[in-house]
Structure formats: C-alpha cells, structure tokens
Amino acid sequence: METRNVMQKPKISCIYLDLDGVVADFTKRYKELYRMEPKEAEKKKEFNKFFDEFIETNQFETLDLMPGAVEGLEFLRKHLTVPTQILSSTANEERYDAISRQKLIWLNTHNITFTPNFVPGKKHKWKFAKPDTIIIDDTPSVIDDWRKAGGIGILHTDWTTTLGILKMYV
C-alpha cells in the first residue's frame, strides 16, 4: 500500500486585513493632493508635512476603494466561515486618535463591518500573529514580521493574486 505525504491545510482562526493599499487607496489620494508618490515625498523629506495636512483635512474618511476591493470583500464576507478583522496602522501614537477616527468613518461609509483593530505603527502588527492567522498586507516588512512571529502572511499586490493565494489556505 502506497502512502503519500499530503500537506494538511492549517485550520485558520482569523484573517487580518490591512486597509491602506489593500482596501483603501491611500496612494491615489496622496498623489492627487501632492503630485507625488508617498515614497518620493519621503525621499524629499516632505512626507510628514504633507501627511499632517492629509490628516488635518480628514482625507482617510473619503479614500477611494482599491481596484478589486469590492470583489475581495465580497469573497471574505460570503464565501468564508473564517472570521475577518481589520488590522490597520495609525502611523504612530500621536496620530492614533485622529487616524483611527477617520478610518472608522471610512469603514462605516463602505459598510465594512469587520472588527477594526488599530495599532500605533505598522511595527506593532506582528503582535496579532499566531500560527493559525493570516494577514493580507501590502507592506513587505509587515509580512516579514508576521511570518517571523509564526503567522501566515500574504503580500498583497492585487486582489486576483491575493484571492488565489488565500484560497490555498481556506
């Protein structure tokens, strides 16, 4: 009798979903307002000045959805029995209240009812990682930290690719 070595899928207890760059289009709005990519503004040492203005004018409340986000959210809502939660950064502790408030308004506007979790910087996301949890995030360092902490990380580039990878786990 032949035995095969079949890899078992881990039972996933929670999927954590980043907002900016995955569901909400931060970069598009930033470019519309400041005529440059956020990374370019960082290189020119102008990011914080613009980011403060971005927050003061409540831009997080009205960001557009990312391409494919509607389909991605639909899949997470209707086709999975795995709970999904939002895990989003507020950049730092000083900006925590303003950004988390704006992001809650954004979630409500888009009828996204997943439990929201906000952390005062992306470097704190790994604290939610467990071997049976998945994070979907567009930041490589977040994915690296998540995996080092024992979780499963999906580096989001687009929703078609992300859903293809996610379906291997759920």
Listing of model-derived features with the role each one plays in the protein:
Residues 61-64, 69-100, 107:
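Substrate-recognition element of Asp-dependent hydrolases with the DxDx(T/V) motif
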Residues 126-129, 165-170:
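Short amphipathic alpha-helix with an adjacent loop that forms part of the alpha/beta core around
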Residues 81-82, 112, 151:
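Short phosphate-binding/catalytic loops that engage adenosine nucleotides
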Residues 88-133, 140-143:
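Substrate-recognition "cap/lid" segment bordering the active-site pocket of phosphatases
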Residues 2-57, 148, 158:
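Active-site neighborhood of HAD-like aspartate-dependent phosphohydrolases
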Residues 134-166:
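Acidic, Mg2+-coordinating phosphoryl-transfer loop and its flanking beta/alpha structural elements
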Residues 74-77, 104, 108, 144-147, ...:
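Class I S-adenosyl-L-methionine
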